[in-house]
Amino acid sequence: MRRILSLLVCLVVGCFSLMASTPRRIVSLAPSLTRSLYYLDAADEIVGCTSYCMAAGRKGVTVIASAVKTSPEAIVALKPDLIIATTLTRQSDLETLRKLGLEVVTYRSGTTLDEICDQFVDLGKRIGKEAEATTLAEASKVVAEDLKQRMSAQGLTGRTMLMQLGDDPLYGVTGGSYMGEMITRLGCINICEDLGQGTLSREYVLRSDPDYIFIIGMGEDRQPMIKRWQSFPDLKAVRLDHLYELEANEVSQPTPITYALALRKMAHDLGLKE
């Protein structure tokens, strides 16, 4: 387990000798895809990104979009040879770019680790990093499976969980999503698994009385959510001090690496021992 995690870290920080790839001018229209380019040692090829991407502010990188709204004119001016986006990006803008002869690749939001890995490898293939992408994807799957097996072996399955994404309105992770898969992969029961939508009432959570609550947010934004739950001392997760935090910039930007690392943190918070 530690060897696999070390491999992931080494790959991310460049301890592997990565194969050279043809230089490209890439525009990324999704934070998760930008993060993937960093993991594939292709950050230097990014010429444009969204204001929410980790490359925003980097020298030589132009911010040409928000989370969903893009500026086709600004993108064209960058003369990219590859534009990568998700289905969250306004499709009419992407069609405009395609009609101008630009290469645009759209990825839908992955709902499982396998889908996330497949997209990661596809991206790697497009930028000449298929071998590196495959290695990272396979290592992430090994980590995830190892955590699953050890959670079961240590008798840590069967607990109920709320994974909270927002507080106003209160929103929980449902089934059919990669975050929902993370919950069940660790052998836990998602109290929102069968809900048609993630918007919750506080009363629903109190009735469900989860053993654990994982709060996803950015930095200090998580503290008010934690304090609000602490105002319900009879709630099992509060009574047992089972309120845990997850960083939104990592969990909400799905890549094989962020999935595996977030899963490992959750497993340890759930009591997994090395």
Tell me what each language-model feature is.
Residues 1-4:
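Positively charged n-region of N-terminal signal peptides that target proteins for export
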Residues 6-16:
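Bacterial N-terminal signal peptides
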Residues 18-21:
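Boundary at the C-terminal end of the N-terminal hydrophobic targeting segment
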Residues 24-37, 131-187:
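Basic- and aromatic-lined ligand-binding clefts that recognize polyanionic substrates
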Residues 24-25, 115-125, 134, 138, ...:
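Structured C-terminal subdomain patch of bacterial secreted/periplasmic proteins
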Residues 24-89:
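A short, structured surface patch at a secondary-structure boundary
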Residues 50, 176-198, 245:
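His/Asp/Glu-enriched short active-site or ligand-binding loop at hydrolase and phosphoryl-transfer sites
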Residues 70-88, 102, 201-215:
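Proline-aspartate-enriched helix->loop->beta-strand connector
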